[in-house]
Amino acid sequence: MHLSALLTLLPAVLAAPATIGRRAEPAPLFTPQAESIIADKYIVKFKDDIARIATDDTVSALTSKADFVYEHAFHGFAGSLTKEELKMLREHPGVDFIEKDAVMRISGITEQSGAPWGLGRISHRSKGSTTYRYDDSAGQGTCVYIIDTGIEASHPEFEGRATFLKSFISGQNTDGHGHGTHCAGTIGSKTYGVAKKAKLYGVKVLDNQGSGSYSGIISGMDYVAQDSKTRGCPNGAIASMSLGGGYSASVNQGAAALVNSGVFLAVAAGNDNRDAQNTSPASEPSACTVGASAENDSRSSFSNYGRVVDIFAPGSNVLSTWIVGRTNSISGTSMATPHIAGLAAYLSALQGKTTPAALCKKIQDTATKNVLTGVPSGTVNYLAYNGA
């Protein structure tokens, strides 16, 4: 991406009202705590107080050049920058910060065996039940976005309630992996779902190998913030993100912008058996961050922990839908997260639409307390419960 045209336009459309020209100090340049940085790719965040019409003018100039343009909840763009372009942008007063782009991956671990125990666990105070108890409102009137590898919408378990909505992976318009379909099944399939009447929308930000760029994931969140306002979701909009990577200011701000738009966001704590405070989007305070539990009421051995974790949910050996009309049992905080997204839809249908913060607190208040073993000090010992 070559931004010569943009850079001549920026002083006219992005300058703060009282200041045109270079800033006193360059805009921060962040490097995310990620395993794989994408060379010469950057995420540029505009200041929130820039007039929308000015931002829209910039978006028009970038449409054919940027990899992604953010124009809804998160304002900016992502793409390739030369050293000269990077320097010029950092000196512009309309730029909030710039961050190197990186790779994010799913938070699931594939396994071959398992049983559908999770629904029984979240509908009983004690472990061991194989019966799922729930109110028959079952998430009706809610829209749940699965920001993942996509959804196989034709799977019979979805009963026509699922839609593959949008792909941010070039040339891939199906779930060729299975992870997103599995998460969607835990949220709202007829057999394996927490909220069996919710509408399900797949937004593909991870490729068929389970990886995606930070910039593409921000695009997915920005898209959901806008799309959720156009759909008939009288009981609220929920998003589920079973993915994660090293700490990223831009990913966290993208998540915060999605929540600020009114969408409840459940995110995976991660599978590294470490404190989640240095991972994104798990460390974003406004998201509802989910750790994983096992069938024996222990913290799953892989689950991250720490003060950023809001709730635990079943995440080991979870049976759900898979691609090509099949089912599969897999483990990870990826599997715990859709339990919470489904529970958010379930409670929203049962009790009415509320704010994302109030809904996460409701999930915490309703949870079964202090039954999990292996939870480190400083981490909440809350296991999801639907109140049935």
Curated annotation (Swiss-Prot):
GO molecular function annotation: serine-type endopeptidase activity
Glycosylation site residues: N296
Secretion signal span: 1-18
PROSITE patterns with a match to the protein in the record: SUBTILASE, SUBTILASE_ASP, SUBTILASE_HIS, SUBTILASE_SER
Keyword Oxidoreductase (UniProt): no
Propeptide residue intervals: 19-107
Keyword list, A-Z: Disulfide bond, Glycoprotein, Hydrolase, Protease, Secreted, Serine protease, Signal, Zymogen
GO biological process terms held by the UniProt record: proteolysis
Cellular compartment(s): Secreted
Domain Inhibitor I9: 41-106
GO cellular component term of the entry, any: extracellular region
Domain Peptidase S8, residue spans: 116-388
InterPro entries associated with the record: PCSK9_ProteinaseK-like, Peptidase_S8/S53_dom, Peptidase_S8/S53_dom_sf, Peptidase_S8_Asp-AS, Peptidase_S8_His-AS, Peptidase_S8_Ser-AS, Peptidase_S8_subtilisin-like, Peptidase_S8_subtilisin-rel
Pfam family, one: Peptidase_S8
Disulfide bond entries: C143-C233, C288-C360
Tagged with keyword Protease: yes
Active site: D148 (charge relay system), H179 (charge relay system), S334 (charge relay system)
Cited function: Capable of breaching the insect cuticle.
Family: Belongs to the peptidase S8 family.
Protein name: Cuticle-degrading protease
